[in-house]
Regions:
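Terminal regions of secretory-pathway proteins
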Residues: 1-206, 224, 229-556
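Alpha-helical bundle segments that constitute or directly flank the non-heme di-iron/ferroxidase center
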Residues: 205-217
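Hydrophobic faces of stable alpha-helices that mediate helix-helix packing
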Residues: 216-220, 395
Length: 556
């Protein structure tokens, strides 16, 4: 597969022509399996980050060019015949080192390369080839509504503006997949619980499924209210207006509640990504700015937050006592657990009560030793995959991105000491021949955090640019009032700003959740106490009630 440099087999060769270190070895040495809990932020922060990531990015698979996806390395960790013959194969070799499965003779981790513009015939002769993103670049909840009219229609009920759902086990759930073995995993019965949504990854882990289900239920709650208030509205009018409201609430949560945690509120204010207590429209749409998702953001900077993942998921009672704990790798692509009695609400409470792992260089072993293990005793390594994906996408080096961001540029390994620890510099020296060879996925993850942020200066630079582009490159962004035909009224915008929060979303869409702390991304504390759900602000939908038109000749 030809990428930007025109070489078919250069995935592990640096721009300087040096052999790059084995991704699995790099993962083990630089990103070992340890757990340090975040002292302030809940697991919601990690999980909402995955919601956002899945909304704006989906690595293109071979299905878009009508080609079956190859198996490059099988479930037993052995190379297949396709490994050498299929151009999309780039299986990750497992080195014979301690803690690297050498005892059970596993040879590799499966890895399938991303489909590029060259593969689809969209690259001119001699031009660079780029990896394809199957999702839209806008914060438009495509993971709920889909990315096309046809997909959206297939997910709609067709009446009352509602989305399709099913009722069973005392709850309301996303539609059931026709064949769970094909959609979720071959290791479960064909009729087992497995969901269909706007994004195919809804089943990936239980807490992702919980939050996506809540967003789906929120749409139908709002649609029912609008339908009751506005009897003359047809199905499509209700659907489109509900979708517009839900997306606006979601954008408000992202920009004013979630992203300040990752990027730092002051950093966002300084870069005009948010504004101080806005009361009016923010008309910053620029038709010359593309909201497109950069390769550096989606393939490196935002994947850094895989470090936040916890390998044990708490199911928590209403009184916040622990009921039980799930092992993450038991439930990859097996969402049935969320339909067990009290599990849906219990996992939602757990997301809001359990701390996430700290943003650091350490990863939970459930993601680096047991990823997607199915019924096997061992699995894959998410961090090794992240490193390999960066090379697959031909990311510029860590040093190149520091230069692009206007940061100090190291010429030697020792020059890194200003922002990377000496112990990590020593590890980098043992893996890379030159400082210019360091992967962006690796170097950026080792930087000391920038002021107010949960990431270092290089990733912060990339992320600030990205989220500025997403808001200013979207003419439908909820705070934009330039076009009165698509803008919210001032009073509607005000209630969206006041009544949109993750806490309210969880309260309204649990099965029997009675209480929540107001700032659900933040751990419970004396300044963030658990309160009754009814006390939390909500969006006032009466502001969408259509005014009755006067009859002709009626002067009253």
């Amino acid at each position: 597969m030809l990428l930007g440099d025109g070489r078919p087999n250069s995935i592990n060769i640096s721009a300087q022509g040096n052999l790059l270190p084995n991704p699995r070895e790099t993962s083990l040495k630089i990103f070992p399996s340890k757990n340090y809990l975040d002292p302030k932020w809940t697991l919601n922060t990690m999980q909402w980050g995955q919601i956002l990531a899945h909304d704006i990015s989906l690595t293109a698979s071979t299905s878009i060019i009508d080609t079956p996806s190859p198996t490059c390395c099988n479930n037993e960790g052995q190379y297949t015949s396709e490994s050498d013959s299929n151009r999309f194969c780039a299986a990750i070799p497992i080195p014979r080192t301690k803690n690297s499965y050498s005892a059970d003779a596993r040879q590799c981790f499966d890895f399938v390369r991303t489909v590029t513009t060259n593969d689809t015939g969209c690259t001119a002769a001699g031009a660079p080839s780029y990896p394809i993103n199957e999702n839209t670049c806008y914060l438009d909840l495509s993971l709920i509504y889909g990315v096309s009219d046809n997909q959206s229609k297939s997910l709609r009920e067709g009446k009352g503006g509602r989305m399709l759902t099913v009722e069973r086990n005392g709850g309301v759930w996303p539609p059931q997949a026709a064949n769970a073995q094909e959609t979720c995993t071959p290791s479960i019965p064909a009729n087992d619980t497995c969901y269909v949504a706007g994004d195919p990854r809804i089943n990936q882990n239980p807490e992702l499924a919980v939050l996506q289900t809540m967003l789906l239920k929120e749409h139908n709650r709002k649609a029912d209210t609008l339908s009751q208030m506005n009897g003359r509205w047809d199905d499509d009018k209700i659907f489109q207006e509900t979708r517009r409201i839900i997306i606006a609430m979601y954008q408000q949560i992202n920009y004013y509640e979630f992203l300040p945690i990752l990027l730092g509120r002051d950093n966002m204010l300084e870069n005009k990504i948010i504004y101080e207590d806005p009361t009016d429209y923010i008309n910053d749409y620029n038709n010359e700015i593309s909201a497109g998702i950069t390769n550096e953001f989606t393939t490196a900077a935002f994947r850094y937050f895989h470090t936040l993942i916890r390998g044990r998921l708490d199911i928590v009672k209403e009184n916040r006592n622990l009921e039980r704990t799930l092992r993450l790798s038991d439930w990859y692509n097996r969402p049935s657990v969320i339909e067990e009695p009290d599990a849906f609400d219990g996992l939602a409470r757990g997301l809001s009560y359990q701390p996430e792992d700290k943003a650091d260089q350490y990863f939970d072993e459930e993601t680096t030793q047991y990823l997607f293990r199915g019924n096997s005793t061992k699995g894959s390594d998410l961090r090794a995959i992240d490193i390999q994906r960066g090379r697959d996408h031909r990311l510029a080096s860590y040093v190149a991105l520091r230069r692009y961001c206007g940061l100090s540029v190291p010429k030697t390994f020792d020059d890194l000491s200003e922002y990377i620890s000496k112990s990590n510099i020593k590890k980098l020296k043992s893996l890379y021949k030159l400082v210019d060879d360091i992967d962006l996925t690796v170097g950026g993850a080792l930087e000391k955090h920038a002021r107010g942020a949960l990431m270092g200066p290089t990733y912060l630079c990339i992320s600030l640019i990205q989220f500025y582009k997403i808001r200013t490159g979207d003419r439908f962004f909820y705070e934009n009032g330039n076009n009165k035909n698509i803008a919210f009224t001032p009073s509607q915008l005000a209630t969206i700003r006041k009544g949109s929060s993750l806490a309210r979303l969880v309260c309204d869409n649990g099965i029997n959740i009675k209480s929540m702390q107001p700032r659900a991304f933040e751990l419970v504390s004396p300044k963030n106490k658990i309160v009754p759900c009814d006390s939390l602000p909500s969006v006032d939908l009466s502001l969408w009630k259509e005014k009755k038109q006067k009859k002709t000749g009626d002067n009253k």
